[in-house]
Amino acid sequence: MNMTQARVLVAAVVGLVAVLLYASIHKIEEGHLAVYYRGGALLTSPSGPGYHIMLPFITTFRSVQTTLQTDEVKNVPCGTSGGVMIYIDRIEVVNMLAPYAVFDIVRNYTADYDKTLIFNKIHHELNQFCSAHTLQEVYIELFDQIDENLKQALQKDLNLMAPGLTIQAVRVTKPKIPEAIRRNFELMEAEKTKLLIAAQKQKVVEKEAETERKKAVIEAEKIAQVAKIRFQQKVMEKETEKRISEIEDAAFLAREKAKADAEYYAAHKYATSNKHKLTPEYLELKKYQAIASNSKIYFGSNIPNMFVDSSCALKYSDIRTGRESSHPSKEALEPSGENLIQNKESTG
């Protein structure tokens, strides 16, 4: 064997080794697990992220995602209970496969498990829902419930068929309906919108009227309260004036009563003092003093009796008639007072 043949052989061996190494070395991305098939049989040991070596041309692998992924189901037909065929353009199913369930699910449903467990189930559940409801319910009334109903139905079946596969969310686009029906629905929605606008305007008008009524009531209540306060103020002023008048009257009455009591007490004391003071002897003394201070001389038979007592007057009358002597005796004139005797003597 010459050198040329040896070089060709070495090059062929190196190329074969390189091809074998290239075919045996593979890379697994983060968030994925690799499952291996050897001769068509699934191996029990999945591999995690990184570089791995396998027997080329004998062992094959499939990468299975274990993080959140979104599967899309497109153009799903759906027949309503009224016989109208509608199409849902796209349904998105967000799901996640747990790493511990990878081997069982791949063994039971292959690495394309989402086609069996999600796509087919979506078609079945959606047709069940549409066939039980009318177009009005599917398109308008119950459309907001389709997402949640599909999610619950899928998760319920997966809990039995494929534990470890979890449905996180389901998003359904608006169904496509026949053009004529769509226009009718649009007109109906437009009329409903107008009705809602009219109802809202009516509510606004009613609210404004209610607001005005409340404002009027509040204003009336305010006026009434102000009037009530003013009335109470006037009543209090009148009551205060009445109270002041009563106090003044009571004070005046007390003063007058005290004054009357004082006058009564003074009069009573004065009467009592006079009672004790005006004795017959004192009166007699005062009479004599009054006669003594009187400088008038009376002549004739009409001498007032107040200046002489009865016995003196009788004696004086007898003297004037001549029954007695022309000059009265000293004893007869003695009660009349000393001044009267002196006056008589001066005129005789």
Curated annotation (Swiss-Prot):
Pfam families (alphabetical): Band_7
PTM statement from Swiss-Prot or TrEMBL: Deubiquitinated by USP25; leading to stabilization.
Transmembrane segments: 8-28
Gene Ontology molecular-function annotations: cholesterol binding; ubiquitin protein ligase binding
Keyword Ligase: no
Record membrane topology: Single-pass type II membrane protein
Record keywords: Acetylation, Cholesterol metabolism, Endoplasmic reticulum, Glycoprotein, Lipid metabolism, Lipid-binding, Membrane, Signal-anchor, Steroid metabolism, Sterol metabolism, Transmembrane, Transmembrane helix
Record InterPro entries: Band_7, Band_7/SPFH_dom_sf, Erlin1/2
Biased composition (Polar residues): 339-348
Annotated localization: Endoplasmic reticulum membrane
Claim: Oxidoreductase is one of the keywords in the record: no
Compositionally skewed regions (Basic and acidic residues) per UniProt: 321-333
GO biological process, alphabetically ordered: cholesterol metabolic process; ERAD pathway; negative regulation of cholesterol biosynthetic process; negative regulation of fatty acid biosynthetic process; SREBP signaling pathway
Topological domains annotated Lumenal: 29-348
Modification sites for N6-acetyllysine: 269
Glycosylation sites: 108
Any single GO CC term annotated in Swiss-Prot or TrEMBL for this entry: protein-containing complex
SUPFAM superfamilies xrefs: Band 7/SPFH domain
Cytoplasmic side: 1-7
CDD domains, sorted: SPFH_like_u3
Sections of the chain in a coiled coil: none
Annotated region (Disordered), positions in chain: 321-348
Role of this protein: Component of the ERLIN1/ERLIN2 complex which mediates the endoplasmic reticulum-associated degradation (ERAD) of inositol 1,4,5-trisphosphate receptors (IP3Rs). Involved in regulation of cellular cholesterol homeostasis by regulation the SREBP signaling pathway. Binds cholesterol and may promote ER retention of the SCAP-SREBF complex.
Subunit structure: Forms a heteromeric complex with ERLIN2. In complex with ERLIN2, interacts with RNF170. Interacts with AMFR and SYVN1.
UniProt similarity note: Belongs to the band 7/mec-2 family.
Name of this protein: Erlin-1
Taxonomic source organism: Pongo abelii
